[in-house]
């Protein structure tokens, strides 16, 4: 069997990726989230497939079909809530994964990092079109508001929006195409994940110390397969507590009301994992400016490899940048909270300050801290 897994064309790929992969011996539990994201993706594809068997992408029956899944299909309620809350777990793992990449300087593996940004954007697109499918009030109005932002693009904006809608408003054509997008995008994500892993295995994993670990590596199996299994069990435990005890805690009550184009909800807001970007969008009074800020809030991550001027890898031995990093995390939490609040004083002001802070920390304060730390190092050596 040993010879077969090392020589067989297909098994050799699996062997080099998950069994005999040389891995740094010092990587901590923060490195577990890559495998957890893989588990989340597989789970979302499987639960989504079973939901798609019973769902109808028609404005007249979409809401009823979701109700039918929950009431009449065997364990349909479980599949539906696993899928909905699985998306939340997916984003929690993804945000931690990106946060770990920033903290430990993993962005210096620039190809892997850039594919990761594409993955984040694709996942956000998938989650957005998926949220429209139950055809509740928040589904309909969320789709209307967010797609309408494209009309801010000069000259072609209005035409583009009508092209995406398939008409002059969000209607049957929109729902059908969003279902098609929601079905195909996870497979595109899977392809990008393979490219992400391909680039990662070209360079090897980073590690908490930020030093070269070529001299101290261990095989991935059994050491990290067991460690990842513990992470998977903890993830599933949290997910099952969420699904079985608090299935609607992360959802919006408005989505239990069928979509009605004549009645606007009091507060239109997306799912919690988009609230930070939504807060940045809302904090700019100009429509086009808001859209650009929304896109840049994710694309700004691509600047990390370019503006990094530190002599050290990661933030482990950089106390000034560490403080700035944790202010950045706190700022993100504030943005998420503000995104869910109504558009009125003081929330608008807090949102604007937090949005300025978000970009300033990445573009100004972190590079400045790196330069100060480099100077301190020069004084010592």
From Swiss-Prot:
Quote the protein name from its UniProt record.
Cytochrome b
The similarity comment for this entry is:
Belongs to the cytochrome b family.
How does the cofactor bind to this protein, according to its record? Answer: Binds 2 heme b groups non-covalently.
Q: Which SUPFAM superfamilies match?
A: a domain/subunit of cytochrome bc1 complex (Ubiquinol-cytochrome c reductase), Transmembrane di-heme cytochromes
Q: Name one GO biological process term.
A: mitochondrial electron transport, ubiquinol to cytochrome c
Q: Gene3D superfamilies, alphabetically?
A: Cytochrome Bc1 Complex, Chain C (1.20.810.10)
Name the source's superkingdom. Eukaryota
Any Gene Ontology CC annotation: mitochondrial inner membrane
Supply the source organism's classification: Eukaryota, Metazoa, Chordata, Craniata, Vertebrata
| Compartments, as annotated in UniProt | Mitochondrion inner membrane
Main subcellular localization, coarse class? mitochondrion
